[in-house]
Amino acid sequence: MPDGKLFIGGEWETGTGEEIVSIFPADGSINCSLYGASKNDVLRAVKLAKSAQSQPSWRSLKPHERARYLYAIADGIEANIDRISQIQTRDTGKTLRETAILASSASGTFRYFGALLESSDDLLTAQRNDSLTMSVYEPLGLVSAITPWNSPIASDAQKIAPALAAGNAVLLKPSSWSPLVSLELAKIIESSGLPKGLFSV
């Protein structure tokens, strides 16, 4: 099981919020307990994310260069499907077969958005008369992703991958009923080399 620390601004730390107890739904046994994020933890994560996202090294990164990070995350999920499946089963009570499918789906989501970045073509309407036609792609900045308890890793991927692909930073708030697989995903995202501060749980 993950050690129950939060991932804020690229660092693992104990949250200063309320205690969260992760329970295995099949028998009611306790997986672990951890402390959630307090308001101050969240405000600090927001500040770090905004700072990281505004850095030219991320904000101005070419789409195909951002794709490398998404592929690395997809590879990390695939390499750890058994562990992710076990954690998600303990967290949600789903079968190992189902959680393996969800983990594989999450990997596919990151891979899809990576491929999209490498193959995106500008869709421009035909220029008329003396007009100027252009497409401008700008990140929004910071995306807050709130995901449900029942399919955490697949839901996480569906929010995180497009946000990172567009050049944003992401703050993930998983359900307090099933936070463990999201923390495991944070380890994979950290090992992908994604610049510090762009992702927090």
Located regions from the model:
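Rossmann-like NAD(P) dinucleotide-binding subdomain of oxidoreductase/dehydrogenase enzymes
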Residues: 121-201
